[in-house]
A protein has these predicted regions:
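Acidic beta-to-alpha connecting loop that harbors the catalytic carboxylate
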Residues: 108, 158-161, 188-190
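Primarily recognizes the serine-hydrolase "nucleophile elbow" in alpha/beta-hydrolase
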Residues: 46-118, 137-138
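A fold-wide structural signal in alpha/beta-hydrolase
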Residues: 14-28, 66, 182
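Conserved alpha/beta-hydrolase "acid-adjacent" motif
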Residues: 162-168
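Catalytic nucleophile-loop/oxyanion-hole region of alpha/beta-hydrolase
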Residues: 3-12, 23-62, 196-203
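Conserved serine/cysteine hydrolase catalytic core
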Residues: 142-150, 166
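Catalytic histidine neighborhood in serine/cysteine hydrolases
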Residues: 175-192
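Short beta-strand/loop motif that positions the catalytic acidic residue
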Residues: 149, 154-157
Length: 204
């Protein structure tokens, strides 16, 4: 909704000092651009294709590109790995938008109702997500595609974050499909815990 490319600048600087190429991405958000979720997915996939297309310019190995993000940005990073639709018409589809690894910070991985969730979540999901996507909300929820082949994934979560349950379902389906998907939890922490203090250092 209100993401900014400055969110992970400190993390980018940390890895750049260690010889990695780190890029922050600006994408359209609903609070500033009156867009829907599938539009944001288009932007994320376009960004991945741009990085891969310009890999030689930046000294990047195009087969070793990780996508990372927090909260809604984590949702979009996951979408680049698991969703094959929602491509911008201007994109060169011959260039893969799929990352080779995922690093996700309290991502929204289950934004549509799933029968394994508590019944009270159904009403919450319908209320929060109604009208947020041009496509059916199931089509823009990473959990829908968790059982497909995907890159290795590490997910950081505070145990008090209500999004953790959806991530557990995502991990369950992903592992059943033979994918590597690990969740690292931090006791008593809520949403966005990694932004400052000791947990910023612990999640680097």
């Amino acid at each position: 909704t209100g993401g900014s490319p400055v969110q992970f600048e400190k993390q980018c600087e940390h890895f750049a000092k260690r010889g990695m190429v780190a890029i922050t991405v600006e994408y359209r958000v609903s609070s500033r651009h009156a867009v829907k979720i599938d539009d944001c997915i288009e932007d994320a996939k376009s960004a991945m294709r741009w990085v891969r297309a310009h890999a030689d310019d930046f000294g990047i190995d195009p087969d070793r590109i990780a996508a990372a993000g927090g909260s809604a940005g984590g949702h979009l990073a996951a979408c680049t790995a698991v969703i094959d639709k929602f491509d911008a018409s201007s994109d060169d589809k011959a260039i893969s938008a799929k990352p080779n690894a995922l690093v996700l910070f309290n991502p929204a991985l289950a934004i549509a109702w799933d029968e394994r969730m508590p019944k009270e979540f159904r009403e919450l999901a319908q209320q929060k997500m109604s009208g947020r996507s041009h496509a059916p909300i199931q089509d823009v929820s990473p959990l829908t595609y968790a059982s497909t082949k995907q890159p290795p994934c590490v997910i950081f979560f505070g145990t008090d974050d209500r999004l953790l349950q959806g991530a557990r379902l995502y991990q369950e389906d992903s592992k059943k499909a033979g994918n590597l998907c690990e969740i690292v939890t931090y006791e008593g922490q809520g949403h966005g815990f990694f932004n400052s203090g000791e947990h910023y250092d612990l999640t680097l």
